[in-house]
Amino acid sequence: MGVVAKNFPIPDLHRVRRVLLSVSDKTGIVAFAQALQTYNVELISTGGTAKVLMAAGLPVRDVAEVTGFPEIMDGRVKTLHPLIHGALLGVREDPSHAVAMEQYGIHGIDLLVVNLYPFEETVQSGADGQTILENIDIGGPAMIRAAAKNHVYTGVITAVSDYDAVLSELKQHDGCLSFSMRQQLAMRAYAHTAAYDTAIAAWFAKNLKIETPSWQSFSGHLKNVMRYGENPHQKAAFYRNGDKRFGVATAKLLQGKALSYNNMNDTDAAFELVAEFDPQNTAAVALIKHANPCGVAEGQTLKEAYLKALLCDNVSAFGGIIALNQPLDAECAEEVIKIFTEVIIAPDATMEAREIISGKKNLRLLLTGGVPDPRCGGFIAKTLAGGILVQSRDNVVVDDLKLQVVTKRAPSQEEMRDLQFAFRVVKHVKSNAIVYAKNSATVGIGAGQMSRVDSAKIAARKAEESAKRAGLTESLTKGSVVASDAFFPFADGLLAVAEAGATAVIQPGGSMRDEEVIAAADAQGLAMVFTGVRHFRH
């Protein structure tokens, strides 16, 4: 059994008379402390924070003066003292606590202002292990947890963004904090220390190369609340974590309204796909709808790539997402504004392109500052009833694979280029996935079918429809190549793509019936390549 609680009245309003400030981020701390002086509070502070406040002419007592004990061990020990923690934890209405506080000269602290050593920033800076360890805060989290536990009497601020809200509350209640505010601050405080400890544990796990730690936590801070989730009856919000990869989470919204839940999901999928193509070597464009590509292409210019991608399925592209691997230029911008698009995401945009796009007020333009490395590690998490599934990112790139020609006929140089292109794309299509490609562009995409044969037939049918809309006399799949995200379990899927006019196939291989499928390919005169890597996507 845990500790038995004592029940005492909870004050709605509690006056702030004594404040302890100890912050790593000094942003706004002087102005905040000056505002507190309006209420005749006593200011206590530590080390660097005390120096900043004193330099501003504020009356401050150093923690060492309060405790009668100096900072020691390079500042590792300064607030870990009964006169500080007793002041944070003392229950004012408890007679035994009151006696102890009187006996030992402990004066309650009514507001704690702490932000922690910048651990995550230190890790991301590439600092060495010893520097990272020195930036693990000890006294700060201990004080935060103590104050949050005793929020009946003590408010606790852990973020600069809370300064204004607390000052507004003090002004409204003539120097007092309401119980509701103290509860909210306590909740944020525990979330803050939990996230801090999560980051530390994650660093240790990574440093020790432990891929599946015995306890896994995930954390993030609220960036924005969406109007709704996937559907209007669902609630949704976006939380930022420590991942600094270029993408939708770190992008700057240059124009347009805030992104919806579906916008965020689709835009992330689009930019992850287009990142498969090195911007130093080629211009690439991906058109996305419901997190699935409806057109992807490479070109000498973004305009060329966009028009090739649009040809694949210009009907589905309407109202979708456009992702570019190079800065948006005016030539491409003139084309993309011809149809309705929800979001454009790109590393940057020229001033001319921005001017062109600005005429479309409902079009969101996101600039990322760069393109993510498709080989970058990380994890993907999915919640289930009663648990969380975690896996590493699918960061295998076709350039790094040892491709095996398994048919009598080897692909031509042109076919091999298109096969590799198609395999980059199929990795980002929902399974079962089939992609037809020709001239470094998708011409038919079959996604999300329970049968691989159905995916092949759907992709071929859509390619035929696109050809008719474009006024072409034959299907786009004639002379194309095909990528499959997983092996063909039977020869029927391969025969379906051959019937559609494909001349070469790239697939993982590994089926019990590989020999049967290879024989069918040889009989059809197809070239086929095995990658040895599957790209299921659910």
UniProtKB/Swiss-Prot annotation:
Pathways per UniProt: Purine metabolism; IMP biosynthesis via de novo pathway; 5-formamido-1-(5-phospho-D-ribosyl)imidazole-4-carboxamide from 5-amino-1-(5-phospho-D-ribosyl)imidazole-4-carboxamide (10-formyl THF route): step 1/1; Purine metabolism; IMP biosynthesis via de novo pathway; IMP from 5-formamido-1-(5-phospho-D-ribosyl)imidazole-4-carboxamide: step 1/1
EC number: 2.1.2.3, 3.5.4.10
GO molecular function annotations of the record: IMP cyclohydrolase activity; phosphoribosylaminoimidazolecarboxamide formyltransferase activity
InterPro entries: AICAR_Tfase_dup_dom_sf, Cytidine_deaminase-like, MGS-like_dom, MGS-like_dom_sf, PurH-like
Reaction catalysed by this enzyme: (6R)-10-formyltetrahydrofolate + 5-amino-1-(5-phospho-beta-D-ribosyl)imidazole-4-carboxamide = 5-formamido-1-(5-phospho-D-ribosyl)imidazole-4-carboxamide + (6S)-5,6,7,8-tetrahydrofolate; IMP + H2O = 5-formamido-1-(5-phospho-D-ribosyl)imidazole-4-carboxamide
Biological process per Gene Ontology, one example term: 'de novo' IMP biosynthetic process
Domain of life, per lineage: Bacteria
Annotated ranges, domain MGS-like: 8-158
SMART domains: AICARFT_IMPCHas (SM00798), MGS (SM00851)
CC annotations in GO: cytosol
CDD domains according to UniProt: IMPCH
SUPFAM superfamilies: Cytidine deaminase-like, Methylglyoxal synthase-like
PROSITE patterns in UniProt: MGS
Keywords: Hydrolase, Multifunctional enzyme, Purine biosynthesis, Transferase
UniProt-listed Pfam families: AICARFT_IMPCHas (PF01808), MGS (PF02142)
Family named by the database record: Belongs to the PurH family.
UniProt cross-references to HAMAP family, sorted A to Z: PurH (MF_00139)
Notes concerning its domains: The IMP cyclohydrolase activity resides in the N-terminal region.
Name of the protein in question: Bifunctional purine biosynthesis protein PurH
